């Protein structure tokens, strides 16, 4: 499993999940519960919708999530979306495995 963990935090509380597709990238967050996880958000798709803004709104609605955790999650989501978009703008295709190696703290799934 891959985790978003704040510095000094004993146990990670959230996992950023990415659905890596040719025409879209989708992001979601799971909450770590014990030794497992539970979905915290739906998947938000880019560029079909503004995935980053939708994720931000969803996280802000959960008042028990610390601001530092929200920022960490959103910063990582920004990196992943920008990476996918930059590759697409250059006409390049990258496998999910390559994306996973660039972002080892993120959990990827997809069709390639």
Swiss-Prot record:
Keyword Ribosomal protein: yes
GO molecular function list: structural constituent of ribosome
Record's keyword annotation contains Chloroplast: no
Keywords, in A-Z order: Ribonucleoprotein, Ribosomal protein
One Pfam family here: PSRP-3_Ycf65
One biological process term in Gene Ontology: translation
GO CC, alphabetical: ribonucleoprotein complex; ribosome
InterPro entries xrefs: PSRP-3/Ycf65_sf, Ribosomal_PSRP3/Ycf65
Cross-referenced NCBIfam families: PRK02724.1
Role noted for this protein: Probably a ribosomal protein or a ribosome-associated protein.
Self-association state and partner proteins as the record states: Part of the 30S ribosomal subunit.
Family assignment from sequence similarity: Belongs to the chloroplast-specific ribosomal protein cS23 family.
Protein name: Probable small ribosomal subunit protein cS23
Lineage: Bacteria, Bacillati, Cyanobacteriota, Cyanophyceae, Oscillatoriophycideae
